[in-house]
Amino acid sequence: MKKIAVDAMGGDYAPQAIVEGVNQALSDFSDIEVQLYGDEAKIKPYLTATERVSIIHTDEKIDSDDEPTRAIRNKKNASMVLAAKAVKDGEADAVLSAGNTGALLAAGFFIVGRIKNIDRPGLMSTLPTVDGKGFDMLDLGANAENTAQHLHQYAVLGSFYAKNVRGIAQPRVGLLNNGTESSKGDPLRKETYELLAADESLNFIGNVEGRDLMNGVADVVVADGFTGNAVLKSIEGTAMGIMGLLKTAITGGGLRAKLGALLLKDSLSGLKKQLNYSDVGGAVLFGVKAPVVKTHGSSDAKAVYSTIRQIRTMLETDVVAQTAREFSGE
């Protein structure tokens, strides 16, 4: 049985969206057990599942504006902290939260703990591409500064995840840069390029540019945390902007525009689905001793369900244990 500790109080629509996503996951997956951490009185009205689920009550939670490290240290009974401790103590196999990203990263670093020989765990997510296959990108903001050695580790981690969780036999690894030529970039990018090119275990395809990411130029894209986070926000903003422009054009374009939208209904729905994070799952703090997964703060029940499905696959493939063995040299 795969045991998942869930912070029921994190996110914009908690606990309703969290619990409703859990209900659906428990209905579809008979091999998972969920521990809900949070205010029992607020959780119970939404909980319809009766088997393989438990509520661990706490009145304390971490708010979105709390300073991450201080919150982890001072709010020892917060729902997120208790969920992370359950993983550390072996009472759960993975932790999920839609709450404060920085606090969850701190919980991953300081409570769950790093895998031996991994210097800086990275935040990774599967982002959309036009062909629907997606690409894994890290670091998306777990670390503001990185060395070339960190980025090399991210390439290995991302490639490992793409192989074992997404089923890609030879993941193409690209280094995000300001040009595709091997001579491009600052000293960090140039040093990283040399490390990746020399690692024969990687299917390194060279530098990739931001404009090509959504065309599926690579299966794994490596970036420092500052750049990766900026690119992630740009992709999210662009996707929302495109959908907003389409909506404005349709609603303000008169009868012809509305008829055109009706004829293109299926195509527009497909586009929306491709750009929607709800089907993809959450961002994984990869490089810690158990799956620590952050779903979007504005996640609905569908996104929570997708993230639980993602965690289930990670546990099923034992990707974290395999990663630990890979880096420890066992």
From Swiss-Prot:
<comment type="similarity">
    <text>Belongs to the PlsX family.</text>
</comment>
<keyword id="KW-1208">Phospholipid metabolism</keyword>
<protein>
    <recommendedName>
        <fullName>Phosphate acyltransferase</fullName>
        <ecNumber>2.3.1.274</ecNumber>
    </recommendedName>
</protein>
<dbReference type="Pfam" id="PF02504">
    <property type="entry name" value="FA_synthesis"/>
</dbReference>
<keyword id="KW-0444">Lipid biosynthesis</keyword>
<keyword id="KW-0594">Phospholipid biosynthesis</keyword>
<dbReference type="InterPro" id="IPR012281">
    <property type="entry name" value="Phospholipid_synth_PlsX-like"/>
</dbReference>
<comment type="pathway">
    <text>Lipid metabolism; phospholipid metabolism.</text>
</comment>
<keyword id="KW-0808">Transferase</keyword>
<dbReference type="InterPro" id="IPR003664">
    <property type="entry name" value="FA_synthesis"/>
</dbReference>
<dbReference type="GO" id="GO:0005737">
    <property type="term" value="C:cytoplasm"/>
</dbReference>
<dbReference type="GO" id="GO:0006633">
    <property type="term" value="P:fatty acid biosynthetic process"/>
</dbReference>
<keyword id="KW-0963">Cytoplasm</keyword>
<dbReference type="GO" id="GO:0043811">
    <property type="term" value="F:phosphate:acyl-[acyl carrier protein] acyltransferase activity"/>
</dbReference>
<comment type="function">
    <text>Catalyzes the reversible formation of acyl-phosphate (acyl-PO(4)) from acyl-[acyl-carrier-protein] (acyl-ACP). This enzyme utilizes acyl-ACP as fatty acyl donor, but not acyl-CoA.</text>
</comment>
<comment type="subunit">
    <text>Homodimer. Probably interacts with PlsY.</text>
</comment>
<dbReference type="GO" id="GO:0008654">
    <property type="term" value="P:phospholipid biosynthetic process"/>
</dbReference>
<keyword id="KW-0443">Lipid metabolism</keyword>
